C-alpha cells in the first residue's frame, strides 16, 4: 500500500522567522511505514548505480542519508556546520532562505573520482545543496545526483542546481 506522503507534512507558518512557511517532516518520520516508503523509494532509485558514498547535509539530510547508505552498503559522508567536524576540512559559505551560513566536510572524506548522491530534506533556494555539491567537487568527487524529500518550487532552487541531475519526492 502506498502512503500519501503529503498528508504527513505539516505546514508551520512564520518558522523559524516571520514570512517562512516551514515544512515540518516530523509527522512523516513518526509514521514508520511512511519513513520506510521514503527510504525504499530512494534505495530503488540508486541501487545498481555504482555509487561510492551517500553525502548527507546537516542536519535533517542525515535522517535520510544514513539509512540509504546502509541499504546501498556504501559509506556515509556528513556535511556539517562549522566547528562540528574534528579533522581538517574543506569549507564553503553560502546564502540560504533566511540568512547565510557555512558548511564543512572532512578533506579525506571522499577519494578523487568518487561518485556520490547528495541528500537533503528540503530544497528551498538551493543554496545549501549547491554548497554541499561544491564541497564534494572540491574533494575531486562527482555528484551523480542530488535528492531531496521536498522541493519548494516557488523558490526555484532547482535553477541553482542546473548542472546536476535532481530528484525530489514531493513538490510544493
Curated annotation (Swiss-Prot):
Its EC number is 2.4.2.7. One of its GO terms (biological process) is AMP salvage. Pathway: Purine metabolism; AMP biosynthesis via salvage pathway; AMP from adenine: step 1/1. It catalyses: AMP + diphosphate = 5-phospho-alpha-D-ribose 1-diphosphate + adenine. CDD domains: PRTases_typeI (cd06223). Coiled coil: none annotated. Keywords: Cytoplasm, Glycosyltransferase, Purine salvage, Transferase. It is found in: Cytoplasm. PROSITE patterns: PUR_PYR_PR_TRANSFER (PS00103). One of its GO terms (molecular function) is adenine phosphoribosyltransferase activity. It holds the Pfam family Pribosyltran. GO terms for cellular component: cytoplasm. InterPro entries: Ade_phspho_trans (IPR005764), PRibTrfase_dom (IPR000836), PRTase-like (IPR029057), UPRTase/APRTase (IPR050054). Catalyzes a salvage reaction resulting in the formation of AMP, that is energically less costly than de novo synthesis. Belongs to the purine/pyrimidine phosphoribosyltransferase family. Homodimer. This is Adenine phosphoribosyltransferase.
Amino acid at each position: 500500500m502506498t502512503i500519501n506522503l503529503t498528508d504527513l507534512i505539516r505546514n508551520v507558518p512564520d518558522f523559524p522567522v516571520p514570512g517562512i512557511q516551514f515544512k515540518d517532516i516530523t509527522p512523516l518520520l513518526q509514521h514508520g511505514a511512511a519513513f520506510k516508503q521514503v527510504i525504499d523509494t530512494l534505495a530503488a532509485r540508486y541501487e545498481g548505480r555504482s555509487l561510492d558514498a551517500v553525502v548527507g547535509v546537516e542536519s535533517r539530510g542525515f535522517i535520510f542519508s544514513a539509512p540509504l547508505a546502509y541499504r546501498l552498503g556504501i559509506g556515509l559522508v556528513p556535511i556539517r556546520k562549522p566547528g562540528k567536524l574534528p579533522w581538517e576540512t574543506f569549507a564553503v559559505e553560502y546564502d540560504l532562505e533566511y540568512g547565510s551560513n557555512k558548511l564543512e566536510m572532512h578533506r579525506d572524506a571522499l577519494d578523487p573520482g568518487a561518485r556520490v548522491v547528495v541528500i537533503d530534506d528540503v530544497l528551498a533556494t538551493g543554496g545549501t545543496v549547491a554548497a554541499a555539491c561544491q564541497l564534494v567537487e572540491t574533494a575531486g568527487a562527482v555528484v551523480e545526483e542530488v535528492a531531496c524529500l521536498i522541493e519548494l518550487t516557488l523558490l526555484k532552487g532547482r535553477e541553482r542546481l542546473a548542472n546536476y541531475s535532481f530528484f525530489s519526492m514531493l513538490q510544493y
